[in-house]
Regions:
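NAD(P)H-binding glycine-rich loop region in Rossmannoid oxidoreductase-like domains
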Residues: 1-22
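Active-site loop of short-chain dehydrogenase/reductase
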Residues: 38-42, 90-92, 132-133, 175-179
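Rossmann-fold scaffold of SDR-type NAD(P)-dependent oxidoreductases
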Residues: 1-3, 44, 182
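C-terminal substrate-binding subdomain of Rossmann-fold SDR/epimerase-dehydratase oxidoreductases
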Residues: 128-260
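Catalytic helix-loop patch of NAD(P)-dependent Rossmann-fold dehydrogenases
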Residues: 17, 21-32, 36, 40-41, ...
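Glycine-rich "substrate-gating" loop/helix at the edge of Rossmann-like oxidoreductase active sites
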Residues: 68, 100-117, 125-126, 140-156, ...
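Residue(s) in the substrate-gating loop at a strand-loop-helix junction
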Residues: 47
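A short helix-coil junction within the Rossmann-fold of NAD(P)-dependent oxidoreductases
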Residues: 7-11, 33-41, 168
Length: 260
């Protein structure tokens, strides 16, 4: 299971070679090491950021690809490397195209460990805890309210998807050795709508300001595919409200364990 990568989109715009070296180059080294040691199965953490923007923001695994940042391009490149390697060897490979993970383990055994994460919910939590402003980056996208649209997938559902995918690897054949799956809820939620859900969950309004998109940002997308349900027997069970609740509930536990 290959989840390792640098993931900060604006940073990838500023430091593309670092991202290509780390995310692509290190993956090639991993695949060579696997081949030397007789390991022929891999589950890769890809990203829905590789999709081209659709007018309705709905995507399936067959939708057009057009990564909008060096980070997204690294995921795009690794997918093609895995496809080619699988067709040229005994490798069986699956790519899970994550949408936007949020939340923590509902039983609070683990959660976000970075003190100041760069993703949207992490920034909301920082603003909520510090009584500072939360910036909606980009409010002129062609969405229903101008803010970016996302498919917020709870990390617990994401973990369940990995278990289902690993079990599915046993069924992968040499005729179809590389497969991809969208891992999302199927519901598009705008950033402004997430702000509203956050305020409802905490009972406290955020001080919201509007700003331009970050370098590498895109309008967004959400999955309308049933492929994961049909082939993996998986579908999302938790909501963005669950993700907000669990992310906040994790904070005192993180403080006990990590001191921040």
């Amino acid at each position: 299971m290959h989840c390792a990568a640098k993931i900060i989109v604006p940073e990838s715009v500023d430091e593309p070679l670092t991202y290509y070296d780390n995310n692509v180059g290190k993956t090639v080294a991993l695949l060579k090491g696997m081949e030397r040691n007789g390991v022929h199965r891999i589950l890769f953490s890809s990203s829905a950021s590789i999709y081209a923007t659709d007018e309705e923001f709905k995507v399936t695994e067959q939708s057009a690809l057009d990564p909008g940042s060096p980070y997204a391009t690294t995921k795009f490149m690794v997918e093609f490397i895995l496809r080619d390697a699988a067709h040229a060897s005994d490798l069986k490979a699956l790519s899970l195209r994550y949408f936007n993970p949020i939340g923590s383990d509902p039983k609070l055994r683990t959660g976000q460990q970075i003190e100041h994460p760069t993703h949207v919910l992490g920034k909301m939590i920082d603003a909520w805890m510090e009584d500072s402003t939360f910036t909606v980056t980009g409010v002129e996208w062609p969405t229903r309210d101008g803010s970016g649209i996302r498919d917020f997938i709870h990390v617990w559902d994401l973990a369940r998807a990995h278990v289902a995918a690993l079990e599915h690897l046993d069924e992968v054949t040499t005729e179809d050795p590389y497969q991809v799956f969208n891992i999302g809820t199927g519901n598009g939620v705008t950033v402004k709508e997430l702000v509203k859900a956050f305020e409802e969950g905490t009972g406290k309004p955020l001080d919201v300001v509007y700003g331009p998109p970050r370098p590498g940002d895109v309008a967004g997308a959400y999955t309308v595919s049933s492929r994961a349900k049909d082939l993996l027997g998986w579908s999302a069970e938790l909501t963005p409200a669950d993700g907000i609740r669990d992310a906040i509930a994790w904070l005192p536990e993180r403080k006990k364990i990590l001191g921040y």
